Amino acid sequence: MFNVVLVEPEIPQNTGNISRTCAATHSVLHLIRPLGFEISDRTLKRAGLDYWQYLDVRYYDSFDELYEKYKDVANFYFLSTKGAKRYSDVNFKDGDFLVFGKETHGLPEPLLEKHYENTLRIPMWENLRSLNLSNSVALTLYEALRQNDFAGLNPKGHLTGRKD
């Protein structure tokens, strides 16, 4: 199971989409306060639809609170346009933490500097500032899952009425 960390997310629709992705992949969602919305926000829950009952979401008052709790048991990877390595060049392991910053500013530079060897980026055209947060989470999380043979996820689909 992977861990997705959102540091001070601002847009409820993004967090709702990420919540749905985490529920669908059986990943834990860690939210670092302050949040730019109320958890009861209908746009947040609408984006997550009926998946909330399957979501494991945990709240923290600071990134340091989360990091101190898990730093000795898992790897932390910090996603940023300023990352040292491409996200696809890392060998992700079950239990790893994928850390994403707020939509308008990303992760704080001191945090990136402190963990520079574990900063990752998603390659993109240099004329654009960044990708959408929920797309970045999905892309990175599914790469981590792919590398681990999608462990724990449904291995095949089923067409209605098909007998094989």
Protein language model annotation of sequence segments:
Residues 1-164:
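Post-transcriptional modification and biogenesis factors for structured RNAs
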